[in-house]
From Swiss-Prot:
The chain crosses the membrane at residues 2-22, 29-49, 108-128. GO terms for cellular component: plasma membrane. It comes from the Bacteria. This is Stage III sporulation protein AD. Keywords: Cell membrane, Membrane, Sporulation, Transmembrane, Transmembrane helix.
Length: 133
């Protein structure tokens, strides 16, 4: 399914317009419109995300890269996007403090997942440096 940016922007603008109209009478309902629009846009893009993941996996297989590293990097990217999405929704609800905690949790989880890759990179670099003894 081909996604057009005009459709995504249109959905976002319609949701924004509806949210602004409803916000005066029912602020909670206005927030739900925003959440629904955000989720709809994300779901609209799932096929493209899937295609990108498959393409990256094919490139990694052709380049003879260990799939554990590729999967870890894809998980890290997923954590970053999900944390950003959750933080933005929380900010939209006026809860900046909670949003910052979501962002912090995402950063910590990314760091935890990156440690094995960083370890391999450091070991590889150290293996390339001639020993001084």
């Amino acid at each position: 399914m081909q996604i057009d940016i005009v459709q995504i922007v249109g959905l976002g603008l319609i949701a924004t317009f509806l949210s602004l109209i409803v916000k005066e009478q029912k602020p909670t309902f206005a927030f739900l419109i925003v959440v629904f629009a955000g989720c709809a846009i994300f779901l609209y893009l799932v096929d493209q995300i899937y295609d990108i993941i498959r393409m990256i996996e094919k490139i990694a297989i052709n380049a003879n890269v260990n799939m554990v590293y590729v999967e870890t990097i894809l998980k890290i990217i997923g954590i970053a996007y999900i944390a950003e999405f959750g933080a933005q929704l929380t900010k939209d609800a006026g809860q900046g403090a909670i949003a910052s905690k979501i962002e912090l949790a995402g950063k910590i989880l990314i760091l935890v997942m990156a440690v094995p890759i960083l370890t391999v990179i450091i070991e590889t670099i150290l293996g390339l440096i001639p020993s001084m003894s």
